[in-house]
Amino acid sequence: MKNSKAILQVPGTMKIISAEIPVPKEDEVLIKVEYVGICGSDVHGFESGPFIPPKDPNQEIGLGHECAGTVVAVGSRVRKFKPGDRVNIEPGVPCGHCRYCLEGKYNICPDVDFMATQPNYRGALTHYLCHPESFTYKLPDNMDTMEGALVEPAAVGMHAAMLADVKPGKKIIILGAGCILSLIHI
């Protein structure tokens, strides 16, 4: 198996580089990435650089966080997955011990490790990536990995619609053309 990944060199220029296939830690799965959605934040990162630039100017910057693929290896403590399982990921991995995480609001954890952003800028535009078992989800049999890559943006869109209390017959305006907004239109 070989691995490569796309990294941002400077705004507007990406490069495909060879990379080692990562080895999963004891609580991680190794995923062969099959599909990656392109989010508005990826477009911004490509055009202007990351929202929060890395402290190290030599830091590799990967893009992409909406992805799905197939498990090819698992860490020694992984119990929910086996090679061959089709999965998608929650791209934000919280600290697990702050006030918000303990209240079940891990999506607003101030120390979340969100793919393609600080602290490590690892992106999903790669052939293989490792991800924690607890933030990896098995796809149902009737969903392919292309659809699986859209679960995260669909969840964000659904959450936004629920917060806005959108109901049939209610007049709303949706501005924008990204993946999430396109899914809200549906």
Map each language-model feature to its residues.
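Cytochrome P450 core scaffold surrounding the K-helix E-X-X-R motif
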Residues: 41-46
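Conserved small/polar residues in nucleotide/adenosyl-binding loops
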Residues: 184-186
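Glycine-rich beta-strand-centered segment in the early N-terminal region that forms part
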Residues: 22-36, 51-99, 140-142
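NAD(P)H dinucleotide-binding glycine-rich loop of Rossmann-like/cofactor-binding domains
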Residues: 65, 95-175
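Residue-level recognition of beta-strand termini and adjacent short loop/turns
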Residues: 10-12, 25
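Glycine-rich beta-alpha junction loops
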Residues: 12, 35-38, 91-94, 105, ...
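Extreme N-terminal starter segment of soluble prokaryotic enzymes
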Residues: 2-4
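Catalytic nucleophile loop
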Residues: 181
